């Protein structure tokens, strides 16, 4: 009798010893192979299923050992995409799951000069984890704008942005460039990164800005018109000269690009008489005197440093008019109205025959 009890106890102890050994072995690294594997945990996945999936992926030695560990562990598993390898212990994997150490991807995004902030919102939302509407809502969020203005980080942002007649306060202030953004970047972080680039670019022309007699808002507004009207540096400087002269002469700028923006149409759309006469604070085609000698209320697109420099280094010419060949993009400049009308007629005839 005693002998049987001893044998039974011995067997139990042996089983416990072997089980403990198996458990410890099962929670060890499966291999020294450090090749990364993407492992996805969907919302609502059970711990038992996670152990099974890890075993099927060849990442752990024992599904049973991990199943037992997860059963007693108080870890709160978070859904997401994780980067794992067989060289990790199951405990290290579970620690990743419980801390939410998910894999963050990044996206390379190019934002082009001359595009509107609504275009930027579309491009960004296609690649990042926020919607176009969320980005535009952030751009228009007065509390966020005030935090930027008062932060001391962006001295070029002033209360001029808070004019409620401006469609999008940060239009013209987000520098066009190629950026690397994390997938989970917020609209706020993206905007701040772009403003950092704007600050860097403006630092190249600090002295010219100081001596210009213009506010940053005026410079960027004028630069946005130049950006849309000209392609070459030489033409940009001449276009800037024309606009400054028209302001000095108390004339309307008469720029179609401002009308397109003011009525929410894209370049190339047909502008109607109603569009040309629309009384919005961007429309420099108004001829009733309300826009004489005035810039639009704010920028109509986001601008390159080339257009900013053109505004600060306008040419020494004395042109009052310009017209572009819509077929070739070439811009022609004139000093008087009759010369301008003749060139318009000539170009219309040329484009009609091509």
Regions found by a protein language model. Name each.
Residues 2-36:
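N-terminal type II signal-anchor transmembrane helix
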Residues 12-19, 34-48, 115, 148-149, ...:
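Short N-terminal secondary-structure initiator segments
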Residues 1-2, 342:
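Generic cytosolic/nucleocytoplasmic N-terminal low-complexity/intrinsically disordered segments
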Residues 5-7, 18, 48, 237, ...:
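Hydrophobic alpha-helical segments
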Residues 2, 41-46, 280-283, 292:
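A broad, low-specificity signal for short, low-complexity segments enriched in glycine/proline
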Residues 26-198:
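Signal peptide-directed extracytoplasmic domains
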Residues 118, 122, 126-129, 144-354:
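Bacterial extracytoplasmic/cell-wall-associated proteins, especially those involved in peptidoglycan
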